C-alpha cells in the first residue's frame, strides 16, 4: 500500500478526506467535508474530516482537495477480449446486421486470440478500469484460438493490478463440439480455482454465449459442470436472430427454453434481454434472474433498445448496468442509459430514477450475490473500494441531487485516486505497484502482432 499509516487491529489505517463524501448507505449519508477511515480491507468509519482526523491522528491521510469521495464503480458486463479491436481495421469486413458483426468481427477476433493476447488485454483493460474508477469487473471472455488457461491469464492480470473481478468463459457450439467441451472445462477449472481463494477478490460463473449457439445437450453439459451456488452468465435476445432461432428450432421463446433447462435463477446473469415478451419477463422475475443492460453497445450494434423501464418498474426485475466491452468507463453507460430510454419511449420523464438505481444500488446488490464483502457502499465493514473524483461543479451538490452531478458533470477521466480492498491502486492519477508505461507499451506491441494474425 502507498504510504505507511497508523497500525490498528492488525492493519494500517488510511484516511481519505477533505471532500464531499457520497456513502450510498441506507440513510444516504452525505458529508460536505467528509472522510472515510479504512482499516485493512474494509471501511472502519465514515464522518467528517475533522472528527476522523482527531480519532486517528497517526493514520495516513489522502487529501481529496475538495473533490468527491465515493464508492468505486462496478461494471456488471464486460468483454476484455475485445480490447485489441480498438482501432483495428479488418479486411473484408462490411457488416449489414448484428450477425455479420458477430461472425465477421468478434468470432474472427476471438479465434485469433492467444493466451498472451488474453493476458496483455487483461492487464491493459484492468488498468484502464482502475483509471476510470472501476473497482469490480464482471467479465465474459472468449478466445477460441486458445481456450485452456485463458481465465487464468485474466486472473493473473487482475491480481497484478489488484482489481476485483468475476470471470467466465463463453461456451458455444460455433467452433465444434471439441472446443465447446474445452470451454466448459475451462469454466469448471476456474470455478474450482476461485473457490479455493479466501481473499474475496476473484469469483467465477459458468459462461455461455447465447441460446442460438448452444444446443440443449451443450446447455445440459454446462449445467452438469456447474456447482451449487454458481450461476450462468449468458446473452439473451440481444438480436432478433436469437429469438427466431429459438422459435424455429425449439418452438418456444429463449427465456422459456432456458427456464426448462434450469439455467435461470438468482445466481444467473442475463445480458441485454432486448427482444423478450411479458411472459419471459415473468420468468426472469419469478426465478430472481439478474438482467444487465448495456445501452451504449446496443446502440452501436443497432440491435434495439431493451424494455428496461418495463422490466424494472412493472416486473421488478433486478437490473444492472454494464459496458459490454464498449468502454471501461461505466459513467458512459449511465449517460447513454439516461437518454436512450427517453428517446425510445418519447418520454422525457423516463429513466431519471431507474438508471442511477441500476448503477448505484443494483450493481452492488448483484455483485454481492458472488462477493461476500459488501460492495458499492461506504459504511463500517463494507469493502474499502473508494475513489476520488476531481469534480467541483458550478452548482451546489447535496444528498438529493448528487446523481445529477455525476450524470451531467463527471466522467471516468476525472478520477484521481482509486483504492481497492484497502490498497491504493491509483494515487494522483498514477497507477501504483506497476510500470504503467510498460503495460501500455506491451499491449500495443502485442496488439500489432494480433492485428497481423487476425487479418491473415
Regions found by a protein language model. Give the residues of each.
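Active-site microenvironment of metallo-dependent hydrolases
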Residues: 5-34, 39-44, 49, 55, ...
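Divalent metal-coordination and catalytic microenvironments
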Residues: 19, 36, 41, 66, ...
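Active-site gating loops and adjacent loop-to-helix segments of metal-dependent hydrolytic enzymes
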Residues: 84-118, 175-176, 240-267, 287-290, ...
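Alpha-helical scaffold segments that flank or form the walls of functional sites
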Residues: 88-140, 145-163, 185-197, 444-446, ...
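Metal-coordinating catalytic core of metallo-dependent amide/deamination hydrolases
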Residues: 141-273
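His/Asp/Glu-enriched, well-ordered alpha-helical/loop segment
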Residues: 261-263, 267, 307-393, 409-411
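A conserved active-site cap/scaffold subdomain adjacent to cofactor or substrate pockets
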Residues: 286-317
